[in-house]
Amino acid sequence: MSKKPNKKQAGAAVHCAHDRLALVTELRPHPKNPNQHPPEQVALLAKIIAHQGWRAPVVVSKRSGFIVAGHGRLAAAVALGLERVPVNDQEFESDADELAHLAADNRIGELAETDGALLKDLLLELDTGAFDMDLSGFDAGELERVINSF
């Protein structure tokens, strides 16, 4: 995997390590992907990618050729009209290993526990009036709830 920092591709900087820049039209979403990406999530992710560039590549299995991580990032790239996305091609020992990674990729993040006080401090530090708070991933109602809860 190579590091190609700050390389612009169709309007989004690439800051993550990746093997290649693939055409979005050549990438194949995994037919067994259980995660759905609602329009609101895709729009928010697109806004973050447009502002910050790519911080994580789309992961493609060398075994099947399907995406195993990054379906939402691909949807955001399509929404932005990007032609190419950074891709990390990975080997999987078996179909079962590939499917387990597909399932675990998002599930592991869901199992994290949030320290509300630290989150509040972090969000208050960002909220200077000069920063677009949408880029934190929280909408105005969620921000208010977090700040008032801790």
Where are these regions (language model features)?
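Short, charged/polar connector segments at secondary-structure boundaries
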Residues: 1-150
